[in-house]
Amino acid sequence: MKRTKTSKAWMQEHVNDPYVQRAKSEGYRSRAAFKLIELDDRDRLMRSGMVVVDLGAAPGSWSQVALRRVGREGRVFALDLLPLDPLGGVEFIQGDFQEEPVLAELESRLGGLPVDVVLSDMAPNMSGIDTTDQARSIYLGELALEFAGHHLKPGGGFVVKVFQGQGFMEYRNEAAKHFHALHVRKPKASRDRSAEVYLVGVGYRGS
């Protein structure tokens, strides 16, 4: 099968992407690591000894960043619909976060541990219809925020990816109620054409 011009252009962009090259040289599984690194460097959410939950973790680059930041005394729990090659120090659950039994398994693994930081890089299966994909993204963001509301300790942090569009401001305003500060960030590693932004909640107010 011949490659299309679009696929050739994507491959060329991927090969020449400085973040892809850095990910390889620094041992990260994907360029997405540098999105979280930039966000955490700016807002200082993760520190040694913390408990972090990483939703939408595959292929594992955000969990790698979290591991490096919380150290041996911390714990990282990761969840994704897709499989994740083993990462030493990461407790992984494979399943759909939208399904109650999967959520129950994650909560069982946590065993009542208060969580310092909830990360969500979850994205919907893309349909190619912008309004549909954006609505699904907001829904996943709502689920992540609900989980954070049940498990974050007071003062905890929250990072969630959502797509801009209809419903974004309503979601942002709802999230802002739960944190002392809420920032909208677009890391340098995010592609310019992408509708994704990250909401960073600092200082969870408690339920």
From Swiss-Prot:
S-adenosyl-L-methionine binds at residues 60, 62, 80, 96, 121. It comes from the Bacteria. Coiled coil: none annotated. GO terms for molecular function: rRNA (uridine-2'-O-)-methyltransferase activity. NCBIfam families: PRK11188.1. The active site is at residue 161. The gene is rlmE. InterPro entries: RNA_methyltr_RlmE (IPR050082), RNA_MeTrfase_FtsJ_dom (IPR002877), rRNA-MeTfrase_E (IPR015507), SAM-dependent_MTases_sf (IPR029063). Keywords: Cytoplasm, Methyltransferase, rRNA processing, S-adenosyl-L-methionine, Transferase. Belongs to the class I-like SAM-binding methyltransferase superfamily. RNA methyltransferase RlmE family. This is Ribosomal RNA large subunit methyltransferase E.
